[in-house]
UniProtKB/Swiss-Prot annotation:
Protein name (record): Holliday junction branch migration complex subunit RuvB
Region feature Large ATPase domain (RuvB-L), mapped onto this chain: 4-190
Domain notes: Has 3 domains, the large (RuvB-L) and small ATPase (RuvB-S) domains and the C-terminal head (RuvB-H) domain. The head domain binds DNA, while the ATPase domains jointly bind ATP, ADP or are empty depending on the state of the subunit in the translocation cycle. During a single DNA translocation step the structure of each domain remains the same, but their relative positions change.
Any Gene Ontology biological process: DNA repair
Species per Swiss-Prot/TrEMBL record: Paraburkholderia phytofirmans (strain DSM 17436 / LMG 22146 / PsJN)
Protein keywords: ATP-binding, Cytoplasm, DNA damage, DNA recombination, DNA repair, DNA-binding, Hydrolase, Nucleotide-binding
Role noted for this protein: The RuvA-RuvB-RuvC complex processes Holliday junction (HJ) DNA during genetic recombination and DNA repair, while the RuvA-RuvB complex plays an important role in the rescue of blocked DNA replication forks via replication fork reversal (RFR). RuvA specifically binds to HJ cruciform DNA, conferring on it an open structure. The RuvB hexamer acts as an ATP-dependent pump, pulling dsDNA into and through the RuvAB complex. RuvB forms 2 homohexamers on either side of HJ DNA bound by 1 or 2 RuvA tetramers; 4 subunits per hexamer contact DNA at a time.
InterPro entries recorded: AAA+_ATPase, AAA_lid_4, DNA_helicase_Holl-junc_RuvB, P-loop_NTPase, RuvB-like_N, RuvB_C, WH-like_DNA-bd_sf, WH_DNA-bd_sf
Length: 354
């Protein structure tokens, strides 16, 4: 798992932050209000109504669960919610809250209607989660004082607050925890037009000269993810300052991204290595993941957790009962003629069932 995390951190098209410097860079570019937030129109519209209603009633906003792939703006939305409500935000993450006392200390220090943001909430320990249930429902927590026979339970009242939980794996949340969120929002991948608007806004904040076609060139290679779009913009800006007097056109962006091994659909060297192995070493598949891992010299976890998700989501790779299969899109992307067998992919499933 360590190797998987290391590879994800090294890829320029990774959806997770790659360094503390990048996290600071992201904070500087974050929109501060809902009206500045680009994309996720449905989620944004819902939050506008719920926040305004809570403010008119002078109540805390209902608890919010944000889920979806990394890099789509869950943390940004948590900060915006607190700012729109005019309250403080306390931020932590599931793995950090190891003991019940850690959570109790946070909850007892919240002021009225404050927002508590827990990232990776699916990684809360069961002990901490048990403390959270009464806090979410009744704004109370039970803590144990003393040890052994003299131990006793004390009930503490809390100020009304809003929990904003973020997760990339909603399926790992327990049902009791999931049921306590009144507002549940899934963040989707962005289209190229939305990402181009984000790139243009970020370039303005960075005082970078960018043409609309340059912004779109970056956007269409950003894998539907604002975090990747902003990271690519930083690298393209560096290239433009050295090679093009700081002027980012489509041609400059294309040259910069080719230098970074990011192709027209956002694939990097590892994506292409995996797909080309399936095409050339295994005749398009099906191939088992262990054989594929050996062929490209990567760990199985790296393939399943880092490389495959985007390829499958975009329709370039298919998982079948017999293994991984390259799709027609993959053949077209590499300029290859698809064999007749690839047009009969359902047959793979049929043969597996017999």
């Amino acid at each position: 798992m360590i190797e998987t995390d290391k590879l994800a951190a090294e890829r320029i098209i990774a959806a997770t932050p790659v360094s503390p410097n990048e996290e600071a860079f992201e904070r500087a570019l974050r929109p501060r209000q809902l009206e500045e937030y680009v994309g996720q129109e449905k989620v944004r519209g819902q939050l506008e109504i719920f926040i305004e209603a809570a403010k008119r009633r002078s109540e805390s906003l209902d608890h919010v669960l944000l889920f979806g792939p990394p890099g789509l703006g869950k943390t940004t939305l948590a900060h915006i919610i607190a700012r729109e409500m005019g309250v403080n935000l306390r931020q932590t993450s599931g793995p950090v809250l190891e003991r019940a006392g850690d959570l109790a200390a946070l909850l007892t220090n919240l002021e009225a209607n404050d927002v508590l943001f827990i990232d990776e909430i699916h990684r809360l320990s069961p002990v901490v989660e048990e403390i959270l249930y009464p806090a979410l429902e009744d704004y109370q927590i039970d803590i144990m004082i003393g040890e052994g026979p003299a131990a006793r339970s004390v009930k503490l009242d809390l100020q009304p607050f809003t929990l904003v939980g973020a997760t990339t794996r909603a399926g790992m949340l327990t049902n009791p925890l999931r049921d306590r969120f009144g507002i549940v929002a899934r963040l989707e991948f962005y289209n190229a037009e939305e990402l181009a608007r984000i790139v243009t806004r970020s370039a303005s904040l960075l005082n970078a000269q960018i043409h609309p076609d340059g912004a779109f060139e970056i956007a269409k290679r950003a894998r539907g993810t604002p975090r990747i779009a902003n990271r690519l913009l930083r690298r393209v800006r560096d290239f433009a300052e050295v090679k093009a007097d700081g002027n980012i056109t489509a041609q400059v962006a294309d040259a910069a991204l080719k230098m970074l091994d990011v192709d027209a659909v956002g694939f990097d060297l590892m994506d292409r290595k995996l797909l080309e192995a399936i095409l050339h070493k295994f005749d398009g598949g099906p191939v088992g993941v262990d054989n594929l891992a050996a062929a490209i010299g990567e760990e199985r976890d790296t393939i399943e957790d880092v490389l495959e998700p985007y390829l499958i989501q975009q329709g370039f790779l298919q998982r079948t009962p017999r293994g991984r299969v390259a799709t027609l899109l993959t053949y077209r992307h590499f300029g290859l003629a698809a064999p007749d067998s690839s047009s009969g992919l359902p047959g793979l499933w049929d043969s597996a069932a017999t």
